[in-house]
C-alpha cells in the first residue's frame, strides 16, 4: 500500500489518518482507476456490444477492489489509519444509470464478460438525474432528481464524439467511459454517450421539465414520463441518440481493425437488451448504405450481427411507436423501416408478424425478431411461453432462432461484496473455487447435517439482520426486532409483481392479532420499490403500504408481533443490506408474467428461502432445491393463460363469496385506514381489486396465506430451517451470470476469450 500512501500525501500533504473520509474516497478513486488502467482491457478481433437503456451498476469502489484482489489490503491499510472501509463506501454516490432488473442484469453481465476474458463493451446513455430519487411525504411517493455525477467520479472522458441527425437539427455527442473490472482479469468499458448542453437547472417541481427542449434535456432522466406525446417522443429521441452513437462507434472500431464492412459479423455482435435499442437495426442499415452497400445486402449484414433478448411477457412493455412520432423525430429512418416491413410482408403476409401494423404502429420487437439472428428468453418457463403463446407466430417461422438463456447474477457483488462473513465462512469450509466456478458451492451439501455448520449459518444471518436493522432505522425511522422473521419483497412496483397480495396478507394478520390470535414468532415485513411516476395504481399500492406501516407501528397491541417497513429510495446500496438479512424471499408474481427475476437468485445465494409462484426462474430454483426447501403456491401458468384466453376470471365473484377475502379487501377503505390515508388512493385501489384485479390477486390469496403461514411456522425449527438455508446456498451456483454469459458466448456470440 506504499503507492496509496504516497498518493494520499501527494494529493493532500498529510497522512491518511489526518484525512477526511471524502479525501480518502477521492484518493482511492484515483488509485483504483490507475490500477484498472495498468491491468489493461480485454480486446479481440470480434467483440460483443451489449446495448441497453439502463445499467444499474451500483457503487463501484469496493466491487472494483474485490475484483482487483486488493480489497483486504486496502481495508487493513485504512484500519491501521483509524478509518473503516464501510465509512468510505458511504461517501460514494450511487450512479443513477438504471432502475430495475433489466439494468441490474446488464451490470452483472458486464462483470461476467470481463471476468471470463471476453472482448466486449456495454453501450448506453449517461443519465444525469437517473429515474428519480424517491421520497415519502404524507404517505405518498414523491419524485425528485437523483444527481450523482461529481467532479471526481468513475466517468472518464473518452475524447470520442459523433453527430446524430434528427428532424431539422443534429446533436453532437460526447463519450464517457466507466471501467468494469474482471475478477482477477482485465477490464472492459461501459461506454456512456451524453450531450454537452445537458441542463439540470431546467428541472422544477419534483421532476418536471420542458420535454420539448431536446438540446438540454436529452440525457437528464432515464425513462422520462411518457404519459403525453412530448414524453413519448423524448423517449424516441433518447433511444435513437443511443443507437446512432453505438452504430457509429461499432463501425469505427471494426474499420480500425481492418474490417471490410461486408464481413461485419466477423468483428461485431450486438445484443439488443429489450426493445429500447431496436432502432440500431435500421440505423446500421442507413450507415452501411451511406458507405455504398446495397440495401438488401446491408439488411443481410445487420441480420447476422444483431441478436435480441426478450425480457417481458407483458404486451404493453413491447414497444410500439406510431409512425407519426418517428416522422417527427427520425424521418430518415422511416423509409428504411418501411422497406424492411415490405420485405417481410412479401414473405409473411399475416398481420400478427408485421413490423408496421394496420394502425401504422411500428413494432420494435417484430423488427428485432425478423432482422436478428437469435431471440432468447431469460428463463426456461419464459422462453416456453414465448414459443407457445406470446411469440408463437414468429416461432412457427423461425424455430431455429429461439433459445433460452436463464438469467444470472454476479457472485462477486451479491455474495463476496455484500456478505463478507458468509463468503469467509464458505471459503473456510470448501475453499475459494466457488468464486470463479459457482457450482462448487454444491460442496456445502456434505455439511447439511453438521450441527456446528448450521448453527454458524444462523449466527451469520443474525449478524446480517442486526446490520439491516440499523440501516432500516436510519432509512425509515422505524425500529425493528432483529429476532423477528425478516420477510422481504424488494423489486419494481408493478401490479403483476403483486405487492398488493403481500399487503392483503399483512391485513389478514393484523385483523387476527386484533381478534386475539397472537403469532408465536414476531415478523417484520420489508418492502422496497419505486413506482413509475405516471403509474397511478402502483403509487396507490405504495400509499397502502405506507399507511399500513404507520397503522401497525402505532398500535401497541400489534406492534410487538408485527412490523411493516417500506424502504425509501430502494437502490443497489439498500439491496446490499437487505439480501444478506432475509429469511423469507417473496417472489409472488402471477404465474406466466415474470420473465425471470434475479432478486430471487440473490436471496437464495444469501440463504433465504423462497415463497413464490411457479413463475420465471422460481421454476428452476424449485427444481434445484427440491420441494422441501421452497414454498410454492398459486395457480399454474397454464391455468392463468387459459383464464386470460377465456376472459373468465371475475374477482368480484371471489370477493363476494369469500368472507376472509372480503374482510381484508374492505379493510383498505375502513375507518382506521381512511383516518390515516387518502380516500381517493385507497378507494381507487379497492375498486381495482374488486372490479378488475387484472393480475388475479384474489385468485391466489388463500393458497398464499396457507403457504406463508406454513413457512412462518417452519421457521421455529431452527435446525431444519438452517438446513433449508444451506441447501439454497449450495444450489445457487447455477444462477451465476458467469454461466449465463458462457452460454451466450457458446450459442450466440462465438467470441474467443483472451488467454
Segments predicted by a language model, with ranges:
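A conserved ligand/cofactor-binding region detector
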Residues: 1-755
Amino acid at each position: 500500500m506504499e503507492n496509496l500512501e504516497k498518493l494520499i500525501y501527494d494529493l493532500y500533504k498529510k497522512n491518511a489518518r489526518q484525512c477526511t473520509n471524502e479525501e480518502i474516497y477521492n484518493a482511492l478513486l484515483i488509485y483504483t482507476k490507475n490500477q484498472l488502467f495498468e491491468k489493461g482491457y480485454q480486446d479481440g478481433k470480434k467483440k460483443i456490444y451489449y446495448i441497453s437503456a439502463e445499467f444499474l451498476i451500483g457503487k463501484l469502489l469496493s466491487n472494483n477492489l474485490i475484483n482487483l484482489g486488493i480489497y483486504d489490503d486496502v481495508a487493513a491499510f485504512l484500519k491501521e489509519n483509524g478509518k473503516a472501509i464501510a465509512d468510505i463506501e458511504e461517501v460514494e454516490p450511487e450512479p443513477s444509470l438504471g432502475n430495475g432488473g433489466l439494468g441490474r442484469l446488464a451490470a452483472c453481465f458486464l462483470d461476467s464478460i470481463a471476468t471470463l476474458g471476453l472482448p466486449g463493451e456495454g453501450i448506453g446513455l449517461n443519465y444525469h438525474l437517473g429515474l428519480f430519487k424517491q421520497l415519502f411525504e404524507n404517505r405518498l411517493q414523491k419524485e425528485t432528481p437523483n444527481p450523482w455525477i461529481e467532479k471526481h467520479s468513475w466517468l472518464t472522458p473518452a475524447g470520442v464524439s459523433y453527430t446524430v441527425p434528427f428532424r431539422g437539427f443534429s446533436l453532437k455527442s460526447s463519450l464517457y467511459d466507466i471501467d468494469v473490472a474482471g475478477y482477477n482479469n482485465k477490464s472492459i468499458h461501459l461506454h456512456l454517450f451524453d450531450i454537452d448542453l445537458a441542463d439540470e437547472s431546467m428541472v422544477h417541481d419534483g421532476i418536471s421539465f420542458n420535454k420539448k427542449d431536446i438540446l438540454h434535456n436529452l440525457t437528464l432522466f432515464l425513462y422520462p414520463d411518457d404519459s403525453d406525446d412530448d414524453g413519448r417522443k423524448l423517449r424516441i429521441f433518447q433511444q435513437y441518440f443511443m443507437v446512432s452513437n453505438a452504430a457509429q462507434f461499432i463501425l469505427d472500431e471494426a474499420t480500425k481493425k481492418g474490417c471490410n464492412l461486408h464481413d461485419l459479423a466477423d468483428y461485431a455482435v450486438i445484443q439488443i437488451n429489450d426493445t429500447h435499442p431496436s432502432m440500431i437495426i435500421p440505423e446500421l442499415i442507413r450507415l452501411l448504405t451511406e458507405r455504398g452497400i446495397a440495401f438488401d445486402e446491408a439488411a443481410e449484414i445487420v441480420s447476422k450481427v444483431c441478436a435480441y433478448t426478450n425480457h417481458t411477457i407483458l404486451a404493453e412493455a413491447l414497444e410500439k411507436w406510431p409512425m407519426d412520432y418517428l416522422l417527427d423525430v427520425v424521418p430518415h429512418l422511416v423509409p428504411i423501416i418501411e422497406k424492411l416491413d415490405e420485405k417481410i410482408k412479401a414473405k409473411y403476409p399475416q398481420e400478427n408478424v408485421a413490423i408496421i401494423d394496420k394502425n401504422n404502429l411500428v413494432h420494435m420487437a417484430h423488427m428485432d425478431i425478423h432482422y436478428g439472428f437469435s431471440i432468447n428468453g431469460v428463463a426456461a418457463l419464459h422462453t416456453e411461453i414465448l414459443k407457445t403463446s406470446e411469440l408463437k407466430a414468429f416461432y412457427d417461422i423461425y424455430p431455429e432462432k429461439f433459445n433460452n438463456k436463464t438469467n444470472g447474477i454476479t457472485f462477486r457483488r451479491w455474495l463476496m461484496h455484500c456478505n463478507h462473513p458468509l463468503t469467509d465462512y464458505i471459503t473456510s469450509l470448501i475453499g475459494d473455487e466457488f468464486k470463479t466456478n459457482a457450482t462448487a458451492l454444491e460442496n456445502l451439501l456434505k455439511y447439511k447435517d453438521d450441527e456446528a455448520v448450521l448453527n454458524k449459518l444462523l449466527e451469520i444471518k443474525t449478524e446480517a439482520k442486526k446490520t439491516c436493522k440499523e440501516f432500516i432505522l436510519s432509512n425509515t425511522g422505524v425500529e425493528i426486532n432483529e429476532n423477528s422473521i425478516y420477510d422481504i419483497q424488494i423489486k419494481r412496483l408493478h401490479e403483476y409483481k403483486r405487492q398488493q397480495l403481500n399487503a392483503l396478507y399483512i391485513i389478514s394478520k393484523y385483523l387476527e392479532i386484533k381478534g386475539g390470535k397472537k403469532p408465536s414468532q414476531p415478523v417484520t415485513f420489508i418492502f422496497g420499490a419505486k413506482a413509475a411516476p405516471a403509474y397511478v395504481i402502483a403509487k396507490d399500492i405504495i400509499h397502502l403500504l405506507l399507511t399500513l406501516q404507520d397503522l401497525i407501528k402505532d398500535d401497541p397491541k400489534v406492534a410487538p408481533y408485527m412490523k411493516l417497513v417500506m424502504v425509501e429510495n430502494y437502490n443497489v446500496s439498500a439491496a446490499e443490506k437487505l439480501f444478506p438479512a432475509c429469511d423469507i424471499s417473496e417472489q409472488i408474481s402471477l404465474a406466466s408474467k415474470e420473465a425471470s427475476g434475479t432478486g430471487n437468485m440473490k436471496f437464495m445465494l444469501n440463504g433465504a428461502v423462497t415463497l413464490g409462484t411457479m413463475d420465471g426462474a422460481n421454476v428452476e430454483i424449485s427444481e434445484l432445491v427440491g420441494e422441501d426447501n421452497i414454498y410454492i403456491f398459486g395457480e399454474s401458468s397454464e391455468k392463468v393463460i387459459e383464464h386470460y384466453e377465456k376472459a373468465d376470471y371475475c374477482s368480484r365473484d371471489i370477493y363476494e363469496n369469500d368472507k376472509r377475502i372480503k374482510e381484508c379487501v374492505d379493510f383498505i377503505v375502513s375507518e382506521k385506514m381512511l383516518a390515516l390515508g387518502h380516500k381517493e388512493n385507497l378507494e381507487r385501489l379497492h375498486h381495482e381489486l374488486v372490479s378488475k384485479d387484472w393480475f388475479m390477486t384474489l385468485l391466489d390469496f388463500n393458497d398464499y396465506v396457507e403457504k406463508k403461514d406454513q413457512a412462518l411456522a417452519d421457521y421455529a425449527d431452527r435446525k431444519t430451517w438452517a438446513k433449508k438455508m444451506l441447501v439454497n446456498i449450495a444450489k445457487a451456483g447455477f444462477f451465476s451470470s458467469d454461466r449465463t454469459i458462457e452460454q451466450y458466448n457458446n450459442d450466440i456470440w462465438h467470441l474467443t476469450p483472451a488467454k
